[in-house]
């Protein structure tokens, strides 16, 4: 009998420690801190609009990163030059032919050389470059920060905040989703 009583008290104390996870539609749910607690319906609507805009910004940042990744990869592939010996300068022809792959290059010594741009088709990783990897990391930092802010908004379990984040994600994807590549390694 004593065993039943102790197991019952342990059970009731552990169940009272759990938090019920239900959505609420309270208009005074704090967002990010107690200082940001809507006090009226208008303030609540403004907070929801802010979350929609923040979710749109998140999708725009992801699309911007995908666009920059494409640009950085294309720049990497076109970075190689081969000097063409015995060729005359073709600067005049280059100006009139938009499809020309031959260009003039002025070297560090001030000598004009004719070069041919060779596109690399290899799938090896791009070498580390400060001019590429620092902006990439900064963009990723922004994406991560905004994503965590959106996650914290959803974790308030407020229906309005949750729907606002979903609406912003939908509108952002609708606007810029075509620029986002899901497989980052398939360039």
From Swiss-Prot:
GO terms for cellular component: plasma membrane. One of its GO terms (molecular function) is copper ion transmembrane transporter activity. It is a multi-pass membrane protein. The keyword Cell membrane applies. Signal peptide: none annotated. It is found in: Cell membrane. It comes from the Eukaryota. Induction: Expression is up-regulated by copper deficiency and decreased dramatically when the copper concentration increases. Expression is up-regulated by the deletion of ctrC. Pfam families: Ctr. The chain crosses the membrane at residues 44-64, 137-157. Disruption phenotype: Exhibits a reduced copper content and leads to cell decolorization due to lower laccase activity, when ctrC is also deleted. High-affinity copper transporter of plasma membrane that mediates copper uptake under low copper conditions. The mechanism driving the transmembrane transport of copper has still to be determined. Acts as a potential virulence factor. PANTHER family: HIGH-AFFINITY COPPER TRANSPORTER CTRA2, SOLUTE CARRIER FAMILY 31 COPPER TRANSPORTERS. Belongs to the copper transporter (Ctr) (TC 1.A.56) family. SLC31A subfamily. This is High-affinity copper transporter ctrA2. The gene is ctrA2.
